[in-house]
C-alpha cells in the first residue's frame, strides 16, 4: 500500500468506504472501514491526497486527516455525482469521489475550523428560531381569524 496517492473516502454514519489509487490512477484497494477504525486505518497509510464529499461530518474528518499529515479536499456532492459510473452504493461513491478530485477544473470547499463551524451554527440556529417563531405567530393569527379576531402584523399583536 506504499504507492497509494489518492484515497476517495465516502463517509457515513457507521461504515466508511475507502477507494485508493496510485499515481497512474490504478485501483489499489476498495475497503469498508468501521467508523471507530478510520483514524487507525489512516495511520498506516503514507501521506496522500484524501478526497471527501461535503456532507455532515466532512469538516470533522478533514481536520482529523490534516492533523495526520494528509492533504484533504472536500467537494460538493453535485460535482461528484457525474462521476458515479454504476449503481449508487458506498463503493461506487468512493470511486467517484476519487475520480472527481483528479479533475483539473474541480471546485473544492474550504475546510472550516471548529471556531468557524461553531459561529455558523449559532447563526443558523438563530435563523431557525426566528422562522419557527414567525410560523407560530402566523398560525395563531390564522386561528384567531377563524373566530373573528383580526390582529395586525407583528409579534407584539399576537
Regions found by a protein language model. Give the residues of each.
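A detector of single, family-specific signature residues
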Residues: 1-158
Amino acid at each position: 500500500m506504499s504507492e497509494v496517492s489518492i484515497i476517495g473516502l465516502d463517509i457515513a454514519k457507521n461504515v466508511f468506504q475507502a477507494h485508493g489509487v496510485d499515481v497512474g490512477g490504478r485501483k489499489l484497494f476498495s475497503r469498508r472501514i468501521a467508523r471507530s477504525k478510520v483514524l487507525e486505518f489512516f495511520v498506516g497509510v503514507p501521506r496522500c491526497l484524501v478526497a471527501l464529499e461535503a456532507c455532515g461530518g466532512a469538516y470533522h474528518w478533514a481536520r482529523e486527516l490534516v492533523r495526520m499529515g494528509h492533504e484533504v479536499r472536500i467537494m460538493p456532492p453535485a460535482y461528484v455525482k457525474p462521476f458515479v459510473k454504476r449503481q449508487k452504493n458506498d463503493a461506487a461513491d468512493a470511486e467517484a469521489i476519487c475520480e472527481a478530485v483528479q479533475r483539473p477544473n474541480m471546485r473544492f470547499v474550504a475546510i472550516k475550523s471548529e471556531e468557524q463551524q461553531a459561529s455558523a451554527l449559532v447563526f443558523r440556529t438563530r435563523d431557525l428560531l426566528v422562522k419557527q417563531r414567525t410560523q407560530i405567530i402566523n398560525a395563531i393569527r390564522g386561528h384567531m381569524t377563524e373566530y373573528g379576531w383580526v390582529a395586525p402584523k407583528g409579534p407584539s399583536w399576537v
